Amino acid sequence: MHGDDNIRGVRWRHGPHIWTLSLLIGLGLGALLAGFVPQRLNESGEPVIPLWLVAPFVAILLSIALMPFVSERIWHRHFPDFSFFFGGITTGYYLRAFGGPSHGMTFGQYNVVHALVEYYSFVALVCGLFVVSGGILITIRGRGRPALNTALLAFGAVLANFVGTTGASMLLLRPYMRLNEGRLRPLHVVLFIMIVSNCGGALTPVGDPPLYLGFLKGVPFLYSLSHFWPQWALVVGLLLGVYFVVDTWYEKRHAAEVPTADPETLRPHRFGVSIEGGTGLVCLALMIAGVFIDPLLKKYAKIEGIPAGATFQLLVAAAAFFLADRRLHEANQFSFFPVKEVGLLFFGIFLTMIPALGFLSANGSALGVNNPTAYYFATGALSAFLDNAPTYLNFLQIAVAPEAVNAASIEALLSQEAGRAKLAAISTAAVFFGAATYIGNGPNFMVRTIAQTSGIRMPSFFGYLFLAIIILVPILILNWFIFIR
């Protein structure tokens, strides 16, 4: 495939040796900057995170958004270098500048290690589910029509709460594209991302990472389902309505553009669904089970801080790949290019997010975040550009301050009506606003890459953001007006 050829070229001509050089240059520059900037401590003796340290994160976002326009060829060959360089700047600065003690390490070391562990878990889940789903072939017999497509996306929104937004996206994207071969437009995929890859997963901790982190911290497992389902129904229902209108318009336009088409091709086919890949289905169940390994180890064996669940998921993904029927891989047009692109880009994103999240954690309460409306829009705005899971935790910390986020503080928060309103604002905003950009939630970028390697010309970073502003944001404002304010 074209994308594979690109990444293969990167690997051999601009591979790990050049990536390492880019990382080392970034580390050196970050360490050099740390030597010129005096460090300050707050009243608690912790380092003050300067706002300018967010610059590498902004730079990597601008690179993702603009470089494909400046030179698509340079970007495809060198995007890992951008990621490693900017990630290296942040890492070098933290390791040299922040030498105070924290959790048995220096403050800088702890934050870098914590970010890398989160990155490892992210890659294990997102890329692991992609590999596993490549060995599952779902065939939907019929022709893509507005009603059928809308029903499929509605099913995906429900499924996301059982296998996660990433799992639902990876399972349904390929059959969705095959069902609509010849009539699929970029907006079809954009709405798939909004509905299946994000907003659909707002009902259970399995659905989306922010809710899972809330569950680990003490939010009851069924709390989201029992309290957020009206918001889920409103947002998902309106997005499905938009999808149906858009797809109906495309259907009429497509029919008008092919007036001489064979009537047989326009006649509805008998509907049917078949699923192949029993090994992949077993591995999918194991991948979801892997999500619960770390909390179980913490609860019953008092073991924490070791990403055992992520390691288990990677082993399951490897087994799924080697045991899969190659015929199913070929039918799914399986390629490792999406895994490579997401894995390499998010390496830099996770590292450069460290100061952004640190600044938010230290200054959130001073930024006027003290009511449900402020929590909703602040959590949402940052979830669109930062990873929505740590953003959720940071605002949850602000909500329970000065207590730490734990089962006791969560119970106290939920015992008050104002506390429940804050949690609703934080939780729904983190999930829903994650759909506003390609990097707001794990599966977004993966879906975009799969679609592009299949020949669909997806919107740019800013193009997608523009569509989110005119489609998604009005719906989320309506959600605020009805349920949050």
Annotated model-derived regions:
Residues 1-39, 43-53, 57, 88-89, ...:
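Intrinsically disordered, low-complexity non-transmembrane regions of multi-pass membrane transporters
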Residues 18-22, 26-41, 203, 213, ...:
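Juxtamembrane and boundary regions of transmembrane helices in multi-pass small-molecule transporters
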Residues 33-43, 69-73, 91-119, 130-147, ...:
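Transmembrane alpha-helix boundary signature
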Residues 48, 63-82, 114, 140-144, ...:
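Flexible hinge motifs at transmembrane-helix junctions and intramembrane kinks/re-entrant loops
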Residues 52-64, 78-94, 119-129, 276-286, ...:
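Hydrophobic mid-bilayer segments of alpha-helices in multi-pass membrane transport proteins
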Residues 91-95, 160, 171-184, 188-190, ...:
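Membrane-interfacial helix-loop connectors
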Residues 114-126, 223-242, 301-315, 377-384, ...:
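Alpha-helical transmembrane segments
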Residues 284-402:
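Transmembrane helical segments that form the transport core of multi-pass membrane transport proteins
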